[in-house]
Each structure stands twice: as structure tokens, then as C-alpha cells.
Amino acid sequence: MTQKTTLVLLALAVITIFALVCVLLAGRSGDGGRLSQPLHCPSVLPSVQPQTHPGQSQPFADLSPEELTAVMSFLIKHLGPGLVDAAQARPSDNCVFSVELQLPAKAAALAHLDRGGPPPVREALAIIFFGGQPKPNVSELVVGPLPHPSYMRDVTVERHGGPLPYYRRPVLTREYQDIQEMIFHRELPQASGLLHHCCFYKRQGHNLLKMTTAPRGLQSGDRATWFGIYYNLSGAGFYPHPIGLELLVDHKALDPALWTIQKVFYQGRYYESLTQLEDMFEAGLVNVVLVPDNGTGGSWSLKSSVPPGRAPPLQFHPEGPRFSVQGSQVRSSLWAFSFGLGAFSGPRIFDIRFQGERVAYEISVQEAIALYGGNSPASMSTCYMDGSFGIGKYSTPLTRGVDCPYLATYVDWHFLLESQTPKTLRDAFCVFEQNQGLPLRRHHSDFYSHYFGGVVETVLVVRSVATLLNYDYVWDMVFHSNGAIEVKFHATGYITSAFFFGAGEKFGNRVAEHTLGTVHTHNAHFKVDLDVAGLKNWAWAEDLAFVPMNVPWQPEFQMQRLQVTRKLLETEEEAAFPLGNATPRYLYLASNHSNKWGHRRGYRIQILSFAGKPLPQESPIEKAFTWGRYHLAVTQRKEEEPSSSSIYNQNDPWTPTVDFTDFISNETIAGEDLVAWVTAGFLHIPHAEDIPNTVTVGNGVGFFLRPYNFFDEDPSFYSPDSIYFRKDQDVTDCEVNSLACLSQTANCVPDLPAFSHGGFTYK
């Protein structure tokens, strides 16, 4: 290579480097040399200010802190000086257990919503424990009007047909604390030798804790609870770490000093008392299995053992959110509804409208139960009715980016439970629009004509999560762009376990050296008050039949022809479908108004559930959740039948306060305001993969409400998200295909709020 050639190449290299530097500098702004900031996505639609929602949502809004405070002040003033803060109340005290919204009568709400009448009077429902009265009882009082209450009325007899016995009351936190004191300071020291030998027990230590079961006894009037004793492992779930000790505590007496241990169970054998257990241990008559103080083996912490990797996918709104939330109301271009949280029953939505037309008045969770089996007394007798504990009460803050999309809208919930002052649960709800990564509908044609048409499936979701002891329930209300509503729940959290001994594998799977994951079922019940094109609806059942016939064009041959069967369900008995029996695959509520094609406008109820067989009716506790007998039941809507369950059923399942079978009285359901009651559930046999805790995958059930001839055609046909192009069109042209414009419309960086968490104690 000549010197001249070398100089030319060197000059070209210098020019190239100079050009690259110029390009890089062109990408810098005049802010001291930093790269120019990318365009940030708008937080609201540029052409739309935050919407002011109609005050019509107010009838269903949960009580505000100011309203809760006003009610409590009124109760303290009018119930006398003997009222004790529930956080400190003993069974012999009078206290306010809870205050929440008293839902308005439907007729009054509709007069306001539909005919411009005055809004219903806002009232509160207060539950009072009168332990200090000569005949202790539970009373329910309606207090109003809010926000300045001037009256209260006792509705106990009106709502329940008589007084509520005191033993039916839910257990206060203070009562659990007194039981804790009794067990760990009065009773366990009687077996300190055995417990030190098996479980590293220290009298002043905190390495053991208790876990409640329910129901509490074997007959009405009992208040005797089996408590399991577990290792307390800091930063990890204690639920899979039983030591094999279970205690039956009788806590019926109003004086905690009179509470007693009725029975003791230890690693497969029953004893009359802890003293007897200790004496037999000292005599060498107890075969003790040593349980390490770091638990029963396995990986129990939810802290990952690997460092964080690359960030997972993130959804954002390139042109701002397409929905808004104000107070309790959500509104999008398609949907509008109010949402709330019952302190005991859980999530609920009201006045649900699609394209401005109401399709349902109320969709709400009613109850959730977990029924267990096992070979220890605690596991074999457990049936948690979560409404008694409080599905709303035990809702948790939603963790941004895990429980909900990072950029979801988060909403607080205010409540007054076991306290004289309101508290706030931060981030109790999240609302978000989600691209499902799935076409709602599509077709690609290569026959005769060449085109593609489709629309992406985006949904609007309202979510809350309740942690009831070991299990976390994720509750979703999902709104689709074709007018369908999806209601579902997923179970996650820790499994409940028992000490593994004997024939334990009849009742589950061994998941650690000394731990049996106990078999159980999850079931939830839902109220669905559909108003399909009006209040007067009819229930229809459709399915298929194979009908033999001669082939018309060749009669010597036969064929089986598929045809639709239709039946009008005229009574509540006809419309009650027991679990395990055949249920019509198409069941829908319809009006007497027709669509363009002459069919009754309807909404179909499609259930996705694996509930299996219900608890046999011979069980003495089965009457407490007779709704569990039915896959689906349709009844007349009645104000005096607001809920299929009761918080009092848990502690007196033998004489339940609410028996759902009373709702099915064979009245007509033709042309009436109807409610569909839906059961969804599944069987869970815990297995190794439930360690460290249960995943949501495959552990979700629920139902759809789907338009059935409600429209003249699929309403998503008018979705602005639709895509259509033909073979002869340029699919890269933004005028033809809006997805081709994403490089412009979605070329922005979302504003990510700082990570926050609602905390572990209520404010």
C-alpha cells in the first residue's frame, strides 16, 4: 500500500469519525450536553379532562371517614357510657363491632337513577355486641340520615326473625388475644418438659403460636375451638410447620378466667389435659417426634434465592388511560358502574351499564368457604366461612406491579371495624385496562377474497385481594368490549397443614418430613341481579338433543340430527340446579323485548367451576351453607333476602341465621325481577408444588355473563380498536391500518410513579 493511499484512507476515517460525532451531538440538547429527554406519555387523554361523574353513583358508595365518625359519635352518645372500644372489649362488655353502608332499597335507588327522583337516604348498619346486658345479645341498628345522623332503629328482628343469641357473634381480636394469653401463659407451662424436648420451648419465648379453626363446637350454644400449635418462623409462613399439638379451648364463659382446655391432641393421641400429657411424657409413655426449630423441612420463605433479572413486560397507555375513576364510580367509553367492598361479604358492583344501558343492578360476592379433611381434630373439623371473619375486613393493600399492573389506578377503602375510629386500607382496589394478548375476534381469508379483520381483546378490570388466615383470594370483575362480564376468583397463599402421622396420606399429600398438606375444597357464592332490558325477566334453558330421522334425500338411510331444545323455567324449584346433576348448558335471563331478529333480548350465565359433590346433607353443619347444594339457582328478588349467608352462621352452623334453601319457595319467576345465585369452586389436594405456597395457575373459577341476542350484532364491531385490510392495500399505511402508526402514537415513555406499598397496619 502506497503512502498516498494510506493518507487517503486516514482522511476518510477522520471524516467518518467527525460525521458520527456530529450525529451524536445532534441528538443532544442544550441542557449541558445530556441526551434529549424522550416524549412522556400523557397521563390523561389530551382532548379530555378528568370526567365529572354523575352523583347518581352516591347511593352505593362505601361510607367515608367523616360518615363513619359521625355514626360512631352518635352511637356513643345514645348507647350510654358503658360502651367499650371493641379493641379492648371483653365478652362481658358492650361494644360496636362494625359500621358499614346500609344499602338502599332497589326501588328507591332506581327512582333516583332512572327517573330523577331524590337520592335515597344514606344510612349505616351498625352491629353491636351487648355482652353487658342481663341477657347478652347481638343487635343490628340502622343509623341515619348521613352525614348528620338523628335516628337509629333496631332491625334485628326485622332482618332475622328474632333476637340473635350472643354465642353466634364473630370472635373479636381481643378474644383471640385473651385465648393467646391463656394458652401460652397459663396452659403450655403445664407441659414444659415435653415441649422443651420436642420443640425447643421456652416459657418466655415466642417460637410457638396458635391458629384457629371453626366451627367452634358440636351443637348450638357451644364456643369451643380447636387451636393448632405451630412454629413461628420469622419472615415465612408458619402454616406448614405444625408441631403436632392441638388444644380444644372452651371460651364460652363471659369471664376469660373461666375458660378451660377441654381436650388435648398430640402427635396422634388424645389426652384429657396438658398435665396428663406431661405426666405420661415423664413416665416414658409418649412417643415424641422431634421437630427441628427451623420448621418441618422444605423451602418456606417467599424471598427468592436468585438475584433480580431483566424487567418483565410492562403495559402502559401510550395516549393516556381510556377510563376514569371518581369516588366509587368507574367510567369508560363502553362501561359505567359503581364498586365497593362489603366489610364481611367482600367485593360488589352496582348499576352496571354497557353503552349507557343497565344490564345488571348488582353483582356481589356473598360467601366463601374452605372445607377440610384430615386425621387430626383440627383438620377434620375445619370449615371456614370467610364472611364471618370478613372478606372485606381482611382485604390487603395491593402491591403495585405484582397484585395489579404497575400503572393501574389504586383506590383506598375506609372502614370501621372493632374500633371506635375509622381506618383506611391503602390501595384496597385497583382498576386497570389490560391487553389480553388475544384477539377478541378475527378472521384471515384466503378463499375467494383475501382480507384480514379482527380486534384485540382489551378488558377493564376491578380487583381486590383478601388474605383470610393462610389463603389469599384474588377477586376480579372483568368487563369485555363485547358486553360480557366475567367474575372470578383465584386462590393463592399458604396451604393449611397438619402434623403427619399414621394414615395421613388418606387426607392429602406429604409435603415435608412432618407435614401433611390437608385436602380441602374452595367454594364461593355470588349474587347476580341481572336487569335485562328492564326489571321483568324470564329464565330460559337451552341445550341440544340428537333426534333420529330418515335422510330426506335418501330415506332408506338414517341420521342423528342435532337440534336445540328450549324450556321456559317458570318456578324457583325448576330453576334450582343441584351440584352433580345435569345443568342446561345455555341458561339465560331474558326480557319480553326482542332484538331485530325476533329473539328475546337476554344475558347468558356461563359457569366455569369444578365444585364436585357438596357436603352431604346429613352433616350437622351443612345447613349453614345450603347454597353449596346448587350450581345455580334463580329466585325472585326480595329486599328481605339480601344475602345468601350470614356472619353468624360460622359460630352456629347448627341453627343458621340464614338458610339459603328458604329462598327457594317455588314461587313464580316468570316476568319477575330475578336474581341468579351462582356457586363456583374447586377441589385442592395439596402437593409438593404448593411449597412454598399455592400458585394461581389452575386455581381460578367463576362465571361469565354473556349477551345472548341482547344486541342485533356483536357490539365490538364498532370498536375503534378494530383492524381490517385487504390484499390490495398497503398494510404499512396508517390510513389503512392504525397499528402501522404505533411508531408515532406509542413512541413515548410512561411516567412510572415511585413504588409504594400500603403497609402492614391500617392507618
Curated annotation (Swiss-Prot):
Post-translational modification: Topaquinone (TPQ) is generated by copper-dependent autoxidation of a specific tyrosyl residue. N- and O-glycosylated.
Entry keyword Disulfide bond: yes
Cofactor: Cu(2+); Ca(2+); L-topaquinone
Keywords for the protein's UniProt record, in alphabetical order: Calcium, Cell adhesion, Cell membrane, Copper, Disulfide bond, Glycoprotein, Membrane, Metal-binding, Oxidoreductase, Signal-anchor, TPQ, Transmembrane, Transmembrane helix
PROSITE patterns according to UniProt: COPPER_AMINE_OXID_1 (PS01164), COPPER_AMINE_OXID_2 (PS01165)
Enzyme class: oxidoreductase
Subcellular localization: Cell membrane
Protein name: Amine oxidase [copper-containing] 3
